[in-house]
Amino acid sequence: MVADSDRGWAWTEAILGVNADVVHVCMSPNAIHIVKMLIKMCGDTYTDIRHKRNSRLIVEDHDFIFPDDIRDGDALVAFSRRKVLMLATLLKKEGYKVSVIYGSLPYSVRKAEVARFLNGESRIVVCTDAIGMGVNLPIRRIIFTESKKFDGKSKRFLNMSEVKQIAGRAGRKGMYDQGYVNSIEDRDQIGELLHGRYEQITSCVIQPPRKVLDMPYSLSEIFKIWLKTIEKKCFSVADLKNRIKLAEYIEKKHGEKINKDLEYSLINIPFDENSEKLKYLWQDLVDMTADGEPVSRMWYYVDTESEDIEAMKLDDLEQLYKKMDLLNSYCNALNISEYDERIRILKEKISELIVRELTNGEFFNKCKRCGKRLEWNHRFGMCEKCYEINKLERMRYKADKWR
């Protein structure tokens, strides 16, 4: 994780700055070199303890057919929330009890879904790669339902670290003597990655520390300077693109009404910056901070009745939970405690309803143009007929444009 361009800085800061007599750092073999470098930079000592996997991990020698080859203890891995929900729906239609796990689920919901699998209430897990971190389940077999994922920039083949991390969930010690791995596509390539040798991580990610605020420039300018001047020997710079945009919003609209220290806190509030609704909410919170009314105007955002939430579908419930997360982080950043209990109650209610939707809801792949139901693994967002119509319309548009 120290090499992750978005979140790696948090692990780097923890290793360099945690105040404790003994620190346990767990990692894959390819991170050992860079972590030892960080420890030596601090003048500290370390003990290198290596663990071996106790259960064998076997790539099956036959192709996996969905849903015919499903067995109890299987975990099906997909790389989008939409595909996870569709697979879960299809399995429930076949009579299977299913737990659903993906990254944007509230922690309490993930915990409830894990508990259902642990106590035998469900026998199959359908999940994203969120299962690869912090989840310990009695999974007998991992099935990759696809071999490529969208990483925020492009759709690419899984890398070695991802395959090893996900596949390693199969074969829990004490329950299974060995774990199994299979795939709906590219089984041989996944097997090669699973048993391949890691490349060493040569740099870790850092972001500007708070002390850079003393520089006589605006925060957005400081971040741009940081990107150009930071020594690159064993460090790489965190992706600051979005935070620079947030800082520029504050500086252009509010100028000196928000000091740099507060601005730094505001731009580091975590939220999904791809969501326009959450971005607008963040801007509203910044605006009311600049107006000096963060406490009195917060009630507007948490004044949601349980009856209104009851009628919501899964998409809206997840969006509302993200909104509550953003409000909670904002209150923490500004030390506002008046709404802690209200936000906690709302998050609990939303989580309960999300569990209900995951258990009882049905989710299918549909053509975004005509609404026709598509196969779960259909490559495009439209049926073949609508795809051809859409392609023809685009050709006509281009022809008209050049007349």
Q: Which residues make up each language-model segment?
A:
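C-terminal or mid-to-C-terminal helical accessory/interaction module adjacent to the motor/catalytic core
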Residues: 179, 191-230
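Conserved strand-helix element at the start of the C-terminal RecA-like helicase core
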Residues: 24-26, 32, 68-94, 98-102
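Non-catalytic terminal extensions of ATP-dependent helicases
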Residues: 211-403
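Post-DEXD/H (motif II) to motif III coupling segment of the RecA-like Helicase ATP-binding lobe
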Residues: 2-51
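Conserved segment of the helicase C-terminal RecA-like domain
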Residues: 30-31, 137, 141-144, 148-151, ...
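Conserved two-lobed SF2 helicase motor
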Residues: 119-136
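Structural recognition of the conserved hydrophobic beta-strand(s) that form the central parallel beta-sheet
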Residues: 22-28, 125-127, 143-144
